From Swiss-Prot:
EC id: 2.1.1.-
Name of the protein this chain belongs to: Ribosomal RNA small subunit methyltransferase G
Cysteine disulfide partners in this protein: none
Keywords carried by this UniProt record: Cytoplasm, Methyltransferase, rRNA processing, S-adenosyl-L-methionine, Transferase
Family listed: Belongs to the methyltransferase superfamily. RNA methyltransferase RsmG family.
A GO CC term assigned to this protein in UniProt: cytosol
Organism: Clostridium botulinum (strain Langeland / NCTC 10281 / Type F)
GO molecular function: rRNA (guanine-N7-)-methyltransferase activity
Key word S-adenosyl-L-methionine present: yes
GN (gene name): rsmG
Length: 239
């Protein structure tokens, strides 16, 4: 009951309904992470309490961003073990989710999770964001692109903004010190058709984690040349 109460409280804070079904899905997901983490590297966070707080509650906090509540489709870029895409799907069943990751082993794990939790309207893509963002079925097709991946904001923006339709949002889940990144990325975000709309500070209760949600609105279409070819984005971020 302790974990149920912790998760319910976090959901209440962002006006999300929480019930036994959602709780059981999250606990099953936690158990699968712990089981599969013995075979492949999914996360360094493996204790029950830490998974609940540092992964699940961190993902719940993304609902502090109003665009998430209104979105019908979302792509999670560099999803890894499924964060934040799978918790978002569990908590907002009516949203269509795409999980993108470059490592096949992680995709195999995510497909197991989707099957075990009986999640609907969710798909996994194996490959590079740079490639999928040039495909007509994915380019500028999503209400929301989100990423919790470890990369600087200028790089993440070129990976993610091309997936977002005009009027949609890219939400970057960043660490506590994001001001310099934002300053360095502002020009690249503008080039890609985005505009920083808000920065939401996040504290995770009973932990030392402090995060920022950087909310970027897509105000114009991304030029056809972006994203650039694989490898170039990280070597030469837009300035």
């Amino acid at each position: 009951m302790e974990f149920f109460n912790i998760l319910q409280s976090a959901c209440n804070d962002v006006n999300l309904d929480f019930n036994d079904k959602k709780y059981n899905q999250l606990i099953s997901y936690k158990n699968l992470i712990q089981e599969w983490n013995k075979k492949i590297n999914l996360t360094a966070i493996v204790e029950d309490d830490e998974i609940i707080k540092k992964h699940f509650i961190d993902c719940i906090k993304i609902f502090k961003s109003s665009p998430i509540g209104e979105a019908k489709s979302l792509i999670d870029i560099g999803t890894g073990a499924g964060f934040p895409g799978i918790p978002i799907k569990i908590l907002k069943e009516d949203i269509e989710i795409t999980l993108l990751d470059s490592l096949q082993k992680r995709i195999n794990f995510l497909n197991i999770v989707i099957g075990e939790l009986q999640l609907k309207n969710i798909q996994c893509l194996h490959g590079r964001a740079e490639d999928y963002a040039q495909e007509i079925q994915h380019r500028q097709k999503y209400d929301i692109a989100v990423s919790r991946a470890v990369a600087n904001l200028a790089v993440l923006s070129e990976f993610c903004i091309p997936f977002v339709e005009k009027g949609g949002y890219f939400i970057a889940m960043k660490g506590p010190s994001v001001e310099e990144e934002i300053t360095a990325a502002t020009k690249s975000i503008e080039i890609l058709g985005g505009k920083i709309e808000d920065i939401i500070k996040i504290d995770i209760e009973d932990t030392d984690l402090k995060h920022n949600l950087v909310i970027i609105k897509k105000v114009k279409e991304t030029g056809k040349r972006y994203p650039r070819k694989p490898g170039i984005i990280k070597k030469n971020p837009l300035k």
